[in-house]
Amino acid sequence: MTRDHFRSAQMFAEAQKYMPGGVNSPVRAFKAVGGDPIFFLRGEGALLFDVDGNRYIDYVASWGPLILGHAHPLVVRAVKECAEFGTSFGAPNELEIELARLLVEALPSVEMVRLVNSGTEATMSALRLARAYTKREKIVKFEGCYHGHADALLVKAGSGALTLGVPTSPGVPEDTARNTVVAGFNDLEGLKELFARLGEEIAAVIVEPVPANMGLVLPRPGFLKGLRDLTAAYGALLVFDEVITGFRLSYGGAQNLYGVQPDLTCLGKIIGGGLPVGAYGGRRDIMEQVAPSGPVYQAGTLSGNPLAMAAGISTIKALAEPGVYEALESKTLRLARGLEEAAARAGAEVYITQTGSMLCVFFQPGPVTDFAGALRSDTARYSRYFQALLERGVYIAPAQFEALFLSTAHTDEHIDRTLEACEEAFRFAFSG
């Protein structure tokens, strides 16, 4: 059954001459699962095709943006038509207005929005704005929540549950990390203790409302509302990082699904339809502090570039059609339940989480409610599972602690074939 990956291996060897590790984002190097990364040639719907001619059912979806699948005709047409008029102007264009309007209309908490080029830019800019607005310096983040690679957010917990952050990457100054406080996700009581101690110094709490970078961890009932109430009581801002969940869990995002309105929202991925994009937005009185309306500086050469705007507009309009999210939820539930049954038949001890069109298979009995729980997963078994699926034509995240994504392009046939492959992969992963 071994597939030929000769051209991919050649390309990886060549890539390592010119790029650190041969990739432009670390997870792509397959370090967490072993072997060499696959080089892809094209995508079509729910399928990916590599440079060696192998075909895969794709559940990575470019790490989430491709909710309509690869090369969706509406998105491709929009980008082609836009490119005929130019790829970038470095000046205002009408498409910026249209995308901004769609975002404001979809998210009740967002009255104004600033478009940027990535999720990292969005979170970095939102936290600068929060600090300026509140005139405070400390930021609270949660263990296991990823908010991009800005220095202030590349921190981990220290020796205690409620400690100041310490750098998790060389090159991050300790002085920068000291203003980031790390708390446990889903631990509202612990957060209350933290605010009792530091509340007057905290500018903002930033959170993935549904974390998708420690696997997929669901918020406990009342946790998000508790964050809203606590931050409001202390005059801190609540920032939802919806770079992944925005327009993924519902039309708008997790805040629409859970009925909790943050002060600021960070977006990315889906709102660019597969092109580089980010955005941050929120209450008018806060957003009017951003230059040139106010003193908080943020800028970008390619911010609001027409190609990303066109791709995002066409994607969001397609998602606004009746029944789209219901259909996505239905097929994802079918896959999740099928995986549970396949694992049981194979004697595989796994714990599956699912919401909307996202899911995760933790290689442990569960439950998983926080970062510490996620870390109990058997990453060696996950690696065997990943490699077995790759050989059977199913492409999932090359790391245990990532979510899987479905798209409107996935069919019942794709799911049936996936479940058949997964049962075999479970047997292989738990055979040794």
From Swiss-Prot:
It catalyses: (S)-4-amino-5-oxopentanoate = 5-aminolevulinate. GO terms for biological process: protoporphyrinogen IX biosynthetic process. One of its GO terms (cellular component) is cytoplasm. InterPro entries: 4pyrrol_synth_GluAld_NH2Trfase, Aminotrans_3, Aminotrans_3_PPA_site, PyrdxlP-dep_Trfase, PyrdxlP-dep_Trfase_major, PyrdxlP-dep_Trfase_small. One of its GO terms (molecular function) is transaminase activity. Its main location: cytoplasm. It is found in: Cytoplasm. Pathway: Porphyrin-containing compound metabolism; protoporphyrin-IX biosynthesis; 5-aminolevulinate from L-glutamyl-tRNA(Glu): step 2/2. Its cofactor is pyridoxal 5'-phosphate. Its EC number is 5.4.3.8. The modification N6-(pyridoxal phosphate)lysine is found at residue 269. NCBIfam families: hemL, PRK00062.1. Homodimer. This is Glutamate-1-semialdehyde 2,1-aminomutase. It comes from Desulforudis audaxviator (strain MP104C). The gene is hemL.
